[in-house]
Amino acid sequence: MTTFSMTVTGSLPMREYVPIAQQAEQYGFDEIHVSDDLIMRPAWPILTLMATHTARVKLGPFIVTPQVANPVYHAANLAALDELSNGRMVCGLGRGGFNQMLGVAKAVKPVRALKEAYLLMEHVLAAKTEPFDGEFFQATADLKFQFPAPRRIPIFIGTWGPQMARMAGGVASGIKADCIGSGAYLSKLRNEMLAGAIEAGRDPSSVKLIVGPLSSIADDRAGAEDCIRGMLALIQPFLAPMTTEAGLDPEAIDAAYRAYVSGDLVRAKALVPQKAIRAFTLTGTPRDVIEQVEELIAAGADHVSFGTPTGPDPARAMHLVGTQVLPHFRRN
């Protein structure tokens, strides 16, 4: 059965996260993913609130990055929250989207570095006693948590790139591929992930594919599309190589972005083509979105995560997904 989750960002007042988590649990979402963006409220305190006010839904940061903090720090937070939530934590680990703000202009050996970060998290969560000696990360034999980490917590690699997907298939629980609405592109990533699992001698069925499209759901399609166009105008420049795969014009992408950052939202939205909405998002009425989700499942998605901005009215969007979209897939 397909797993369903929703993704929230750190853009909201802290008081709003508990009711959101409780509503998501009531609607039957399986998981809630919290973005850990450098310039917004961090995921860990939000997840702490959610863990103490829910009982069933799984929770996790998607994604944390070793560019912001050492993998051991992320692993310690993850283990502590797994204890608090009675074993409900999951996690995403990736390169991060704001590295340039930290002076990281170009990553060095990004696939190898992220693999090491993953392996170090696994190392300390498993309470291994030997040293960890990597090219990018090290830990002495003395580095071990002074509290129990009772289980192997699922950790997914956040990526929409083929090389990272192949690496993840060899070591991780799977991948989370955000901003993908295209079944064709998703199928390519899945093939890379499964190839990585086979190369590593793993059972391919043991690695899972989470897809996290940007989402805008409303009672009318026009309102949903208007909402998502602004988001796309802002983030399209950061979606390579998927923009090339989708056949989008680089000059139009740049023009939409410049219009957005200059405050001309009307022009920015007008410059976002329909095929961008189709390539990166789940957008429209519940009926529209059901058809799009079915395409992603047919392409190999094990788990669909409804991403931001959710819709012009986020509460209404959650209601529509919870009362119309999820029940459709639970029945089938």
Question: What residue ranges belong to the model's regions?
Answer:
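Active-site-adjacent structural elements that line small-molecule/cofactor binding pockets in enzymes
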Residues: 1-332
